[in-house]
C-alpha cells in the first residue's frame, strides 16, 4: 500500500478545479480526481485572516508521481502558494489500487 497516495488541493473556482483534474487524468498523473461541493476555508495570508469559498480536489495516484503532480498543479493554479498535501493510502481495495496502477504512468 505504500506506493499509493491521496493528494488534496484546493481551488478558488470550480472551473479551475476541473481544469486541474482533467489535466492530471489526461496526462496519466492521476487515476481519479474528485471535486467537492464548495467548502468554506479560513486561513491567514500575509497578515490577514481570510475566509473564502473553495473547491477541494481529492487526487488518487502513485507516490512516484507526487513531484510531477505538484509541478503540474503549480503551473495551472492561480494561487501563489496552492495547497498540495499528500497522504499515504494505508489500506484499500486491491482491485481499486490495481486500477490506479493501470491508469497512471
Label each region the model flagged.
Residues 1-105:
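Positively charged, small/polar-rich N-terminal and surface patches that mediate targeting and assembly
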Amino acid at each position: 500500500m505504500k506506493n499509493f497516495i491521496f493528494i488534496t488541493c484546493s481551488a478558488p473556482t470550480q472551473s479551475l478545479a476541473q481544469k486541474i483534474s482533467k489535466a492530471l487524468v489526461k496526462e496519466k498523473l492521476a487515476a481519479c480526481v474528485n471535486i467537492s461541493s464548495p467548502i468554506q476555508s479560513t486561513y491567514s495570508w500575509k497578515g490577514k485572516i481570510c475566509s473564502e469559498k473553495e473547491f477541494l480536489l481529492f487526487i488518487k495516484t502513485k507516490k512516484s508521481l507526487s513531484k510531477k503532480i505538484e509541478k503540474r498543479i503549480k503551473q495551472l493554479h492561480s494561487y501563489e502558494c496552492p495547497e498540495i498535501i499528500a497522504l499515504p493510502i494505508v489500506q484499500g481495495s486491491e482491485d481499486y489500487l490495481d486500477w490506479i496502477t493501470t491508469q497512471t504512468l
